[in-house]
């Protein structure tokens, strides 16, 4: 049972990077795709992921592409990392009036800054609160899973996690298959029909 919910705010100051602005694409083989898995039992709220994301993607201070929520449940505290779920049926894509938000064949949901008019329709449509209007660019912004780093490197949040609470890889990867097969993997807000492709394990009573 969910007792309380508190957002953990983490402010990163004077961290500047332009690494996350590319539109890089890579080719998948045999219909494989990338997925993101979070093991809540391994997260203790250190926020290394939040800081790494901000540095890698030049996220404005006070805004977040990834964040960590703290829940008190059944006498224990659970830290739950949140990001864009890169859904298979993304409501944000359907809501965009100019087709600036799109889904790639690799499974990512991305935003074309050159097309986005900053109307906010996609922000309102996202059931996960994963989008915001970038105050510098004036366009919608969100997690890209550091697509400019893949496949040579992992997303910054995954690479920086000291407990390996975040896992990112192809569905065919051994590590991903093992986690999804041995643990009770769930998605958030499945009832929305968005078909999210971010999976959580060791999670109970959190949306």
Curated annotation (Swiss-Prot):
One of its GO terms (cellular component) is plasma membrane. It is a peripheral membrane protein. Residues 34-63, 75-106, 107-136 form the 4Fe-4S ferredoxin-type domain. Its main location: membrane. This is Tetrathionate reductase subunit B. [4Fe-4S] cluster 4 binds at residues 96, 116, 119, 122. Part of a membrane-bound tetrathionate reductase that catalyzes the reduction of tetrathionate to thiosulfate. TtrB is probably involved in transfer of electrons from TtrC to TtrA. PANTHER family: PROTEIN NRFC, PROTEIN NRFC HOMOLOG. SUPFAM superfamilies: 4Fe-4S ferredoxins (SSF54862). Residues 1-28 form the signal peptide. GO terms for molecular function: 4 iron, 4 sulfur cluster binding; metal ion binding; oxidoreductase activity. [4Fe-4S] cluster 3 binds at residues 84, 87, 92, 126. [4Fe-4S] cluster 1 binds at residues 43, 46, 49, 161.
């Amino acid at each position: 049972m969910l007792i309380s919910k508190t957002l953990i705010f983490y402010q990163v100051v004077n961290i500047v990077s332009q690494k996350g602005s590319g539109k890089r694409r890579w080719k998948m083989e045999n219909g494989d795709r990338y997925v993101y898995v979070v093991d809540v039992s391994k997260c203790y709220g250190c926020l290394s992921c939040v800081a790494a994301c901000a540095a890698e993607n030049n996220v404005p201070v006070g805004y977040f592409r990834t964040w960590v929520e703290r829940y008190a449940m059944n006498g224990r505290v659970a830290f739950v990392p949140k990001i864009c779920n890169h859904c298979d049926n993304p409501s944000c894509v359907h809501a965009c009036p100019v087709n600036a938000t799109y889904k790639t064949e690799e499974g990512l949901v991305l935003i074309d800054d050159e097309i986005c008019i900053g109307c906010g329709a996609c922000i309102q449509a996202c059931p996960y609160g994963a989008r915001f209007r970038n105050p510098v660019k004036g366009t919608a912004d969100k997690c890209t899973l550091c697509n400019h780093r893949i496949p040579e490197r992992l997303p910054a949040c995954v690479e920086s996690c000291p407990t390996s609470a975040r896992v990112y890889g192809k569905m065919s990867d051994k590590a991903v298959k093992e986690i999804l097969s041995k643990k009770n993997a769930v998605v958030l807000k499945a009832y929305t029909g968005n078909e999210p492709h971010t999976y959580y394990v060791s999670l109970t009573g959190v949306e």
